[in-house]
Regions:
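C-terminal catalytic-base region of ester-bond hydrolases, centering on the histidine
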Residues: 276-333
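Domain-level recognition of soluble alpha/beta enzyme cores
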Residues: 24-123, 310, 324
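Primarily recognizes the serine-hydrolase "nucleophile elbow" in alpha/beta-hydrolase
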Residues: 196-255
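Secretory targeting and sorting signals
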Residues: 1-24
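The feature captures the conserved acid-bearing segment of alpha/beta-hydrolase catalytic domains
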Residues: 115-117, 238-294
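Active-site machinery of serine-nucleophile hydrolases
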Residues: 63-65, 74-92, 134-175, 287, ...
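Short substrate-entry loop that stabilizes the transition state in hydrolases
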Residues: 104-120, 125-163, 270-272
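Alpha/beta-hydrolase active-site loop
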Residues: 157-159, 163-212
Length: 333
């Protein structure tokens, strides 16, 4: 199965040109961060001893004085980048994504020291159901350039493919979407997020720079639901941001009130969903957007109206990045 996906990357390369998707060696595809700081990045492996040594991968994005270079989007090993990209594209039913994800780069200084800006506010980000953490790289890098530490989290077993430092790739199982499955995944995700919160002061490179009294949780889709669920119950969390998500799923306890500053940014179907009627916060509706307009897919596959609607990637980025920064500046800056 994996071999077939890898081979498909070569087969779709010509199609990307025909459809107008940019193809280039080391192409960035992602927008340049808009803040004044360069961006650092470090991958982190966390082990939860309370859950049979469950291993969780995360990436910390942060401001640095080191000039950013063009770095691989997924993996430093090209073959593993191709494998992971092919798997993610297969899960999203968009084979053209395999090419752009595998070729993409991000402007980041890997492992560089944190800029001496004092203690920095923190955002922990949970991706959508069956979506890898790297599809939030554009947003994470932009917030980092504005002075935030952003930790994106992969939920092992649910994420399509997660690479660990030893080169091992943990392939996930496609979601079942049954009530029982959704309840199990919410529990696993919430515990993953709390693990990151517990370990913030110990994280490599950024641990001594984070301000654990200024924390926001954010997420896309089911990741937004995860953020709201944890944020509502954990006193360490000061704010919650939900990108195109709702607050109820079959099988999972609904979030009926959010006792924190909250942002909902999404398509009309999300912003008018009944689960948000009792929640007071900032609501930003983006007509014409698609569910994945709030992720890097908006840049990596702009021709997909199924995933990204009719709003351009540049427009989706501008709205998402600016509204997130405005909300976070008011909530935890």
């Amino acid at each position: 199965m994996v071999l077939a996906r890898i081979l498909s990357v070569a087969l779709v390369a010509a199609a990307t040109l025909a459809l107008g998707v940019p193809q280039a060696h080391g192409a960035s595809f992602l927008p340049t961060p808009t803040g004044p700081q360069h961006v650092g990045r470090v991958d982190i492996r966390l082990v939860d001893r309370q859950r049979d040594d469950r291993a969780v991968m995360a990436t910390a994005w942060y401001p640095t004085d080191t000039e950013a270079a063009s770095r691989p989007y997924i993996s430093h090993d090209p073959a593993r980048s191709v494998q992971i990209a092919a798997t993610v594209a297969d899960w999203l039913h968009e084979p053209l994504l395999a090419t752009t994800m595998a070729a993409a780069t991000v402007p980041a200084a890997d492992g560089a020291p944190v800029a001496p800006l004092g203690d920095l506010p923190v955002v922990v980000f949970s991706p959508g159901m069956a979506v890898p953490r790297f599809l939030a790289s554009g947003l994470a890098a932009d917030l980092a350039s504005r002075g935030y530490v952003v930790v994106t989290v992969d939920h092992t077993g649910e994420s399509p493919a997660v690479e660990f430092p030893d080169g091992h790739i943990a392939y996930g199982t496609p979601p079942a979407y049954t009530p029982e499955y959704m309840a199990e995944q919410l529990t696993a995700r919430a515990t993953d997020v709390r693990l990151v919160l517990d370990r913030l002061p110990e994280l490599p490179v950024v641990g001594t720079a984070v301000d654990t009294t200024r924390i926001a949780l954010a997420g896309h889709s089911f990741g937004g639901f995860t953020a709201a669920t944890v944020g509502n119950a954990d006193p360490r969390v000061d704010a919650v941001a939900v990108l195109d998500g709702v607050l109820t799923y079959d099988g999972a306890p609904p979030v009926e009130h959010v006792e924190r500053p909250v942002l909902l940014l999404g398509v009309p179907a999300a912003t008018t969903h009944p689960s948000w009627q009792l929640v007071h916060g900032d609501v930003v509706e983006v007509p014409g957007a698609g569910h994945y307009s709030f992720t890097d897919v908006a840049n990596l596959l702009p021709v997909s109206t199924r995933l990204c609607g009719t709003v351009s990637g540049a427009r989706a980025n501008a709205i998402t990045f600016d509204r997130m920064a405005d909300f976070l500046d008011r909530a935890i800056r």
